[in-house]
Design a protein with these regions (language model features):
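Bacterial N-terminal signal peptides
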Residues: 10-20
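Blade-edge motifs of beta-propeller repeat domains
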Residues: 24-44, 76-93, 125-142, 173-190, ...
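Glycine-aliphatic tripeptides that mark coil-to-beta-strand junctions in extracellular
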Residues: 58-60, 107-109, 156-158, 204-206, ...
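Hydrophobic beta-strand segments that make up the repeating blades of beta-propeller
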Residues: 62-66, 111-114, 160-163, 208-212, ...
Length: 379
């Protein structure tokens, strides 16, 4: 065989037809929509990022979970894309994630931290000025991985679902004063580092979807709630895809909560469209980056369709995946190399009052957070 003429004429014609471009041109990547605006130092080993308003000033703030020095870094937003120098606070051993909610019903956001090494979740009651009162710990089972807040028994108080390393999920009911009380334990069939809560079947009872990632029994597992802090037997979707992270967003504007998830099996992302009855479509695959690990959804271009940004742990980058007019995802992705490498966390918000979604990523290796602002005109 002539090695200099590997592709035959029919093969070249097929590839050219596939891409719909003369001369077999490859498709262009997503436009360059972001530019690096700021870099900030945080604690050691940032592994999770949260956008929230800690001090109720209307400006989005950032919280990083720093696993290596068991701390949180609080970055208060100025509203122009910059943030004040991080304030670091020590929490219990090996925190892995943080979420926010009004746990004690005083109208002020509180933080709830999952502390893997201490085997507990910790409530940090907010004062409304960005500071916090004495932590309130709640003991969990062995090696907690993730905490999900929602009102699971319809009493107007936030409850917590905590996933454990050894394939279990514990349900804690909230008493409305910052304290939680254990109620039920469920088998998940697989460890879960990520999950979300929403009413998937329209019965006004909160349900749970978990990214169950153990390779032998991996799937997206959906637990439909009974409205009294108990749940039905889970249903599994996207089996054997090893989902690592799952987020919730209405991706097709039908007012039903859809699921987008990253997997440990290849570099693709997947989406499950909600049918509104508690069930979901077959997984729809689209391209991610090198080692997709964490996700955020926002309007990352002017077309009003929900787009996806993914943190890539293997390629030290994050990738932007925008939508086409027909709802499909653009290929190839636009990739942004992160200075500090080892990107484990990503979040988004309007950090400069531009009316457009911006992106923050955390480098686990160099202990920094990078801010990327959206361009008004794209390259």
């Amino acid at each position: 065989m002539n090695r200099h003429h590997f592709f035959s004429t029919p093969a070249i014609f097929f590839i050219s037809t596939l891409f719909g471009l003369p001369g077999c041109d490859l498709p262009s990547p997503t436009p360059d929509m972001f530019y690096k605006f700021d870099v900030m130092s945080v604690g050691k080993g940032p592994s999770y990022l949260l956008t929230t308003d800690l001090n109720l000033d209307g400006e989005p703030d950032l919280v990083t979970v720093n696993t290596k020095d068991s701390s949180l870094s609080l970055l208060y937003g100025k509203g122009d894309g910059t943030f004040h120098t991080a304030r670091n606070i020590t929490v219990a051993a090996e925190p892995t994630m943080v979420t926010s909610g009004d746990i004690n019903r005083d109208g002020i956001p509180d933080l709830v931290v999952n502390a893997r090494g201490a085997e507990m979740i910790i409530v940090l009651p907010g004062n409304g000025d960005g500071s916090f009162r004495k932590p309130i710990p709640t003991r969990t089972g062995k090696v907690p991985l993730n905490v999900i807040l929602a009102d699971f028994n319809n009493d107007g108080k936030l409850d917590a679902a905590v996933t454990l390393t050894f394939d279990e999920m514990e349900i804690f009911t909230g008493s409305g004063d910052g304290y939680f009380h254990k109620r039920q334990t469920y088998s998940t069939g697989s460890r879960s580092f990520s999950g979300v809560a929403e009413d998937f079947n329209g019965d006004k009872k909160m349900d749970i979807a978990l990214a169950a990632s153990s390779s032998s029994a991996s799937s997206i597992r959906v637990f439909l709630g009974n409205g009294n802090s108990t749940f039905q037997k889970p249903k599994s979707y996207a089996k054997q895809l090893v989902p690592l992270a799952v987020i919730l967003k209405d991706m097709n504007a039908d007012e039903k909560p859809d699921l987008v998830f990253a997997t440990g099996k290849g570099d693709n992302l997947f989406m499950l469209y909600s049918k509104g009855d508690g069930s979901f479509s077959k997984p729809i695959s689209f391209s991610g980056g090198g080692g997709p690990f964490a996700l955020t959804v926002g309007n990352f271009n002017p077309d009003k369709l929900k787009d996806v940004a993914v943190a890539n742990s293997r390629s030290s980058s994050f990738s932007l995946v925008t939508r086409n007019a027909n709802g499909t995802f653009h290929y190839p992705t636009r990739d942004y190399v992160v200075e500090g490498g080892t990107v484990l966390a990503i979040t988004s918000g309007d950090y400069n009052h531009s009316g457009m979604s911006d992106i923050a990523v955390a480098s686990n290796f160099k202990n920094i957070v990078e801010i990327y602002l959206q361009r008004r005109s794209f390259k």
